[in-house]
């Protein structure tokens, strides 16, 4: 098949796809499918010759919101490829927050030691971790959490048991989880139902010692409500790889809070994922040509 890679040329990904016998072309009008690796505003108008779109990201909610995802073409994302990197980054964020790395960095002084001694918490100390959006990344995170002997709660749409979780609840039956968990990890897709799912009401149900981690999408959290909760001691802290707004302005109060750890949307990095997306694309091409559902095909109605 002929493909166009847009808007960025990833040479390592291109080499993998071309190694499978496919040809990269410059003009989208000459292509059978598009490998898209940009932001939503960069998405091009699709001509009728494009049979499917292979997105390089795990979630295409930004494209759905922009209104470009429709049934004119089939769509596939990169779900599953981010499991190892994002799960490892999540462990790092949890530990950095619980071990008060931000407080130590901002203090710039050894005098912060008494504060850390009195307030540092430990993941292995009978903690409960709730994973909201327990798909492929969540399952890998559950595996990485095992050595810490934590109790784990998975929350998903269906309520079907998630491998490795001690308990699983459907989203509409998980209200009690807000008061039960010590650590909340958000890996949800962004939909109308999940937009600002963490807000003043849900934050108010959490333990004062709770830690909130977001490696999903920034707008899952009402940022103003989070700032208030962190200032007022409603929860203990937050660790954020994604924010709303994003990028987070340099003057935003979250940067100066000693109970907040922030990474700039780097729970996964492009360099790590590029070769993997090439291999996934080859698999999806094979399934597409066989008339089967692609391995990571997206329901264009649901958006994931």
Curated annotation (Swiss-Prot):
Pfam family, one: 2-Hacid_dh_C
Keywords recorded for this protein, A-Z: NAD, Oxidoreductase
Keyword check for NAD: yes
Coiled coil: none
GO function terms (MF aspect): NAD binding; oxidoreductase activity, acting on the CH-OH group of donors, NAD or NADP as acceptor
SUPFAM superfamilies noted in UniProt: Formate/glycerate dehydrogenase catalytic domain-like, NAD(P)-binding Rossmann-fold domains
Protein name: Uncharacterized protein in proB 3'region
Origin species: Corynebacterium melassecola
């Amino acid at each position: 098949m002929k493909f166009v890679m847009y808007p960025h040329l990833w040479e390592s990904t291109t080499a993998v796809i071309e190694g499978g016998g496919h040809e990269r072309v410059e003009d989208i009008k000459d292509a059978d499918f598009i490998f898209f690796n940009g932001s939503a505003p960069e998405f091009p108008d699709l001509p009728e010759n494009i049979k499917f779109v292979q997105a390089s990201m795990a979630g295409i909610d930004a494209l759905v919101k922009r209104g470009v995802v429709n049934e004119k073409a089939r769509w596939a994302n990169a779900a599953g490829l981010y499991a190892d990197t994002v799960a490892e980054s999540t462990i790092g964020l949890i530990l950095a927050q619980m071990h008060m790395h931000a407080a130590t960095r901002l203090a710039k002084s050894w005098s912060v030691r008494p504060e850390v001694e009195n307030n540092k918490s430990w993941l292995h100390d009978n903690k409960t971790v709730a994973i909201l959006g327990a798909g492929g990344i969540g399952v890998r995170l559950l595996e990485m959490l095992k050595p810490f002997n934590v109790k784990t709660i998975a929350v998903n749409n269906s309520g079907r048991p998630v491998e490795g979780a001690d308990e699983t609840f459907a989203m509409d039956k998980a209200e009690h989880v807000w008061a039960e968990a010590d650590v909340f990890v958000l890996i949800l897709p962004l939909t109308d139902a999940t937009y600002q799912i963490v807000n003043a009401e849900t934050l108010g149900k959490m333990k004062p010692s709770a830690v909130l981690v977001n490696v999903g999408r920034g707008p899952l959290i009402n940022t103003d409500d989070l700032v208030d909760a962190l200032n007022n001691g409603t929860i203990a802290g937050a660790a954020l790889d994604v924010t709303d707004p994003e990028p987070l302005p340099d003057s935003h109060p979250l940067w100066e809070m000693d109970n907040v750890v922030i990474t700039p949307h780097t729970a996964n990095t492009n360099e790590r994922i590029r070769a993997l997306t090439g291999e996934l694309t080859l698999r999806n091409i094979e399934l597409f040509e066989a008339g089967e559902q692609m391995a990571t095909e997206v329901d264009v109605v649901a958006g994931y």
